[in-house]
Amino acid sequence: MQTVTLSIFRFNEFEKRLWVLGQMTANKLGMHYLPKAKFWKMFGSGTGQGFTPKPNWHVWSILAVWPDEETARREVAESPIYQRWTKMADESYTVLLQPTSAWGKWDGKEPFEPVKPASDVRPIAALTRATVKFWKAERFWAREPAISHMIGRNKDVVFKIGVGEVPFVQQVTFSIWPDARSMEEFARGAGGPHGEAIKAVRAENWFKEELYARFQILGTIGKWEGKDPVGEALTARPSEAPKPAPAPAAAQPAPAAEAPKPAPAPVAEKPALAVEMPKPAEPPKPVVEAPKPASAPVASKPMPQGGKPNFKGKPGKGGRKENA
């Protein structure tokens, strides 16, 4: 999955700053090459909050697009360009990013391949790149002081830097925020200097080319100003795992409570069968009635007629007495 790295380097000594200026010149002449990178750029930076036309000769950066995170980490650690810059710099810091959205072009290309995240991204990184029309540059930079003042006071912003390929006209801003809401409030807040600048850009068509991208943060390498500001934000971000935890806890008791309910039903059916089982024992009633037919032969009335003994022994005697 595509991975983007933004590496920033600080060169405190004058000789080191001269060295990095030579590196930038060599890059412009095509003497540098990153074979594994799909797209890459070298930048200078601005003073103050970073979003100014006045250069900061101490801070320089490299942005590169790699096929995957493994390649990105390996190249940042082993590529000759990165090794030279890291060795010469007093401080270096790399943020590894995964594009989640992108719109626009950079030098006529679409360098980022966004992948929609599975969940809300926190923290979130935003990058804007624009080529300002030369005759609009003065009006563009006139908006800068108010924007720098606003972002400098914003407690939500985790990290920010302004860099550029060509002074005054090719600018890149990079910032990291706790979430999309805080970023949107700064960028498009009603009446805010940044929101007003966006309106002016659209109304007066300041840009020759522009690109906007958002990223999920994969990790960091190194330190900046003696700490890892982005790594700290990743550690301190609102944990999304505990929120789902209460749901399963509430859901599990429900099935557990319903499970015993089927159990009483079978228990109730068994006694019913046990009660009905004795009913077939009613056949003893015919046993009681059996003697009744036996009493019928005892009360036999045909005996006075002579019965079978008189009929065989003395047939006429008994008959005559009956008639007399």
UniProtKB/Swiss-Prot annotation:
Summary of the protein's practical applications: Could be biotechnologically utilized to produce more diverse oxo chemical structures.
Task of the protein: Involved in the biosynthesis of the carotenoid spheroidene. In vitro, can use nonnative substrates and produce oxocarotenoids with a hydroxy and/or a keto group, derived from neurosporene, lycopene, 3,4-didehydrolycopene or 3,4,3',4'-tetradehydrolycopene.
InterPro entries: CrtA-like
Pathway recorded for this protein: Carotenoid biosynthesis; spheroidene biosynthesis
Enzyme class: oxidoreductase
Region (Disordered): 226-324
EC number, as in UniProt: 1.14.15.9
Compositionally biased region (Low complexity): 248-278, 287-313
Protein family membership: Belongs to the CrtA family.
Gene Ontology biological process terms, A to Z: carotenoid biosynthetic process
Catalysed reactions listed for this entry: spheroidene + 4 reduced [2Fe-2S]-[ferredoxin] + 2 O2 + 4 H(+) = spheroiden-2-one + 4 oxidized [2Fe-2S]-[ferredoxin] + 3 H2O; spheroidene + 2 reduced [2Fe-2S]-[ferredoxin] + O2 + 2 H(+) = 2-hydroxyspheroidene + 2 oxidized [2Fe-2S]-[ferredoxin] + H2O; 2-hydroxyspheroidene + 2 reduced [2Fe-2S]-[ferredoxin] + O2 + 2 H(+) = 2,2-dihydroxyspheroidene + 2 oxidized [2Fe-2S]-[ferredoxin] + H2O; 2,2-dihydroxyspheroidene = spheroiden-2-one + H2O
Keyword terms: Carotenoid biosynthesis, Heme, Iron, Metal-binding, Monooxygenase, Oxidoreductase
Cofactors that this protein relies on: heme
Cofactor detail note: Binds 1 heme per subunit.
Record lineage: Bacteria, Pseudomonadati, Pseudomonadota, Alphaproteobacteria, Rhodobacterales
Name of the protein this chain belongs to: Spheroidene monooxygenase
GO molecular function annotation: metal ion binding; spheroidene monooxygenase activity
